[in-house]
């Protein structure tokens, strides 16, 4: 019994020490929401947080460990990867120790946040460690990391740290409020672009698209011959698609020869590498096959 008690005490002490070390670089982010979120001091004077928690672009404040409140400014936000970057005066606040190493399923992890200056922690495991995936908004995320732990909204944007003591990802709430994590390698890439330009490059088609099934259900469109494609429901007057000759009511059925079934597939194809490329669109126009070449533009800043 004594050995068991000593082992548990040692585990408890090491866990608390790991949280304490990590929490030195974790802040609370106040941006007009119902409650604050958390953020990671990623580089000197640079805080990373979850893009979805920012209710406004101005009047952002940070609560540092210990409770001191400071002003922060938005450097950029990328909803496609759920990464936002803030600038502030660190005044000696340590930068988080990070790693690009991918976690494994079963790894024991800690989610560390900041609640009004106090440390916030949740213990769990990596439930699923998968490969690259695309978010619903088209962002490329290097690893799919699903967590088996209780993540509160206040902890969203905080650090996911492994037994080695390094921050491997940022914790966020995914669909159905399941805890997932954005890996450090994805964050690094987003931070570089957001600091340089305030946004992450994304391709721009300049066309509003909708699944043809929705139109069929209302009797609006006959669809393509084989049932594939997405319907063009709006066009940017100055956008690439309008300039190339795309028309309202066209059905996009293929992208460089690859069949298109869902709007989400088009979003995935409009990644940073697509800007400036010429794409061959397969179409159904008035019930007949057609084709069009479109030079992909850069998504304008809203």
Predicted regions mapped to residue ranges:
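PDZ/PDZ-like domain segments forming the peptide/carboxylate-binding groove
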Residues: 149-159, 210-254, 258-261
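Gly/Ser-enriched beta-turn/beta-hairpin loop segments
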Residues: 75-82, 129-145, 193-201, 212-229
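Short, well-structured beta-strand-loop connectors
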Residues: 103-108, 161-167, 247-254
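Active-site region of chymotrypsin-like
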Residues: 23-25, 84, 88-97, 120-177, ...
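C-terminal cap/linker of serine protease catalytic domains
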Residues: 1-19, 111, 163, 167-225, ...
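Conserved active-site neighborhood of the chymotrypsin/trypsin-like protease fold
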Residues: 2-7, 31-120, 144-145, 153-154, ...
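A cytosolic small-molecule/anion-sensing beta-strand core signal
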Residues: 42-43, 162-163, 256, 285
């Amino acid at each position: 019994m004594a050995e068991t008690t000593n082992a548990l005490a040692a585990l408890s002490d090491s866990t608390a020490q790991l949280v304490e070390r990590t929490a030195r670089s974790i802040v609370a982010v106040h941006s007009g929401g119902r409650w604050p979120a958390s953020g990671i001091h990623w580089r000197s004077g640079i805080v990373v947080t979850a893009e979805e928690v920012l209710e406004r672009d101005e009047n952002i404040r940070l609560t540092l460990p210990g409770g001191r409140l400071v002003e922060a400014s938005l450097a950029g936000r990328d909803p496609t990867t759920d990464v936002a970057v803030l600038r502030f005066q660190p005044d000696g606040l340590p930068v988080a120790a990070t790693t690009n190493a991918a976690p494994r399923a079963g790894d024991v992890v800690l989610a560390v946040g900041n609640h009004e200056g106090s440390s916030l922690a949740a213990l769990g495991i990596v439930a699923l460690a998968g490969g690259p995936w695309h978010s619903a908004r088209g962002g490329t995320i290097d690893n799919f990391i699903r967590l088996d732990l209780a993540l509160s909204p206040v902890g969203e944007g905080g650090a996911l740290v492994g037994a080695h003591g390094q921050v491997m990802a940022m914790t966020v709430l995914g669909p159905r409020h399941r805890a997932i994590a954005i890996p450090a390698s994805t964050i690094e890439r987003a931070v570089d672009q957001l600091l340089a330009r305030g946004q992450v490059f994304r391709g721009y088609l300049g066309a509003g698209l909708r699944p043809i099934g929705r139109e069929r259900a209302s009797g609006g469109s006959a669809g393509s011959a084989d049932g594939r494609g997405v319907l063009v429901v709006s066009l940017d007057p100055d956008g690439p698609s309008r300039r190339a000759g795309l028309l309202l009511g066209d059905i996009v059925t293929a992208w460089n020869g690859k069949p298109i079934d869902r709007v989400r597939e088009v979003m995935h194809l409009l990644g940073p590498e697509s800007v400036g490329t010429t794409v061959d669109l397969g179409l159904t126009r008035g019930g007949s096959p057609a084709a069009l070449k479109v030079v992909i533009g850069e998504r304008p800043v809203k």
